[in-house]
């Protein structure tokens, strides 16, 4: 870690490192995302993966347009395009939304959670000028991507994809998302 830390320090002084237990792996992904959001200092929180790349040159200038209010209220969830059918995988969430609801997500399906909440609250904005490539094994069949992180998603002993998806669809979590959307709408109204 020291080598990576030194590299980051040379690159920028605006980073934080968070060490935490692995927990249940994919089943606890939302816990890690929420922990990172709590210490983030930026205006937007960007849900991202280590197997993804933004391919649009100048994408940060496009986000700056949203930040400056050129496309409506900057307090929004901005969705970007990618190379597969699910178009809500890498949202940028305004920090006020996180602060208003007190979390990014309460389920490992962070992208789906915030998409449903933002859509219902009327604060979701599509930004298809920004393109990303997601090199996930089940999308690209790239054998080097069939690693421990990928296989952990399907591990039912640790609350893998199917268990967390069932929880996501439960009445309890649906009600929480409805409450999240209402909190956001009330915050936007002032």
Report residues per predicted region.
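Short beta-strand-to-loop element that shapes/binds the nucleotide-sugar donor at the catalytic cleft/hinge
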Residues: 74-90
């Amino acid at each position: 870690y020291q080598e990576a830390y030194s590299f980051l320090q040379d690159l920028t002084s605006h980073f934080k490192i968070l060490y935490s237990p692995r927990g249940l792996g994919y089943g606890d992904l939302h816990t890690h995302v929420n922990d990172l959001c709590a210490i983030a200092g930026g205006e937007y929180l960007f849900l991202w993966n280590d197997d993804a790349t933004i391919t649009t040159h100048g994408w940060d200038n496009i986000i700056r347009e949203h930040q400056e209010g050129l496309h409506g209220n900057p307090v929004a969830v901005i969705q970007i395009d990618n190379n597969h059918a699910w178009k809500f995988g890498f949202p940028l969430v305004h920090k006020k939304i996180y602060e208003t609801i007190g979390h990014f997500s309460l389920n490992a399906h962070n992208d789906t959670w915030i998409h449903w909440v933002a859509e219902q609250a009327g604060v979701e904005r599509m930004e298809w000028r920004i393109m990303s490539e997601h090199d996930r094994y089940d999308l690209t069949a790239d054998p080097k991507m069939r690693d421990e992180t990928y296989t952990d998603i399907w591990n039912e002993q640790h609350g893998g994809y199917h268990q967390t998806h069932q929880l996501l669809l439960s009445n309890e979590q649906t009600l929480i998302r409805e409450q999240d959307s209402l909190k956001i709408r009330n915050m936007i109204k002032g």
